[in-house]
């Protein structure tokens, strides 16, 4: 996935949440437009403890090149925007795609991205959070299976409970 226009001082919390949702809901990695090594370290720390070493985080300076290269290798680009076609109307087509680059913006997104996207997809045509958009999009594309992801390389795990909280170290100790 691609996070466009990350502004370290203004967007650090939301971009962190976008990356966490991407990882937890099955994305293979995130490209962040900009340079924020503190954010990259935060996500790498989460991966180190909670698992998912396959998840890559990469800071990039030229997102248009990434989009062009992605499309040149047969990938499809999905731009999440409130101005797009509502997800229920395109979700079956999206489930058939193999290589998807999902774009979410931090600041106003240039028209170029709307034109280059294979799909401009709305999660309702109302303003709301890009974190919510990404979560709902991944849930629909992965048909809910992302909720069953087990990170075999995690150092700790949550044991689901009706009441209370239980976290275990994966070396067998509590």
From Swiss-Prot:
Entry keywords, A to Z: Cytoplasm, Methyltransferase, S-adenosyl-L-methionine, Transferase, tRNA processing
Catalytic activity: cytidine(56) in tRNA + S-adenosyl-L-methionine = 2'-O-methylcytidine(56) in tRNA + S-adenosyl-L-homocysteine + H(+)
A cellular component annotation (GO) from this entry: cytoplasm
Keyword presence, Cell membrane: no
Main subcellular location of this protein, as a coarse class: cytoplasm
Location within or outside the cell: Cytoplasm
Disulfides per UniProt: none
Keyword flag Cytoplasm: yes
Any single GO BP term: tRNA nucleoside ribose methylation
Assembly and interaction partners: Homodimer.
Annotated protein name in UniProt: tRNA (cytidine(56)-2'-O)-methyltransferase
């Amino acid at each position: 996935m691609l996070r466009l226009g990350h502004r370290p001082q203004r967007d650090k919390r939301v971009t962190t949440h976008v990356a966490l949702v991407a990882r937890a809901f099955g994305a293979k990695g995130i490209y962040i437009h900009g340079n924020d090594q503190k954010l990259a370290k935060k996500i790498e720390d989460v991966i180190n403890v909670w698992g998912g070493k396959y998840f890559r985080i990469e800071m990039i300076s030229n997102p248009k090149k990434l989009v062009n290269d992605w499309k040149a290798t047969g990938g499809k680009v999905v731009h999440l925007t409130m101005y797009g076609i509502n997800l229920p109307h395109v979700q079956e087509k999206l489930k058939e795609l193999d290589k998807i680059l999902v774009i979410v913006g931090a600041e106003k997104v240039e028209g170029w991205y709307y034109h280059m996207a294979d799909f401009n997809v709305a999660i309702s045509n109302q303003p709301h959070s890009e974190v919510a958009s990404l979560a709902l999009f991944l849930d629909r594309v992965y048909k809910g299976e992302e909720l069953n992801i087990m990170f075999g390389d995690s150092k700790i795990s949550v044991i689901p409970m009706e009441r209370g909280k239980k976290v275990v170290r994966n070396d067998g100790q509590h």
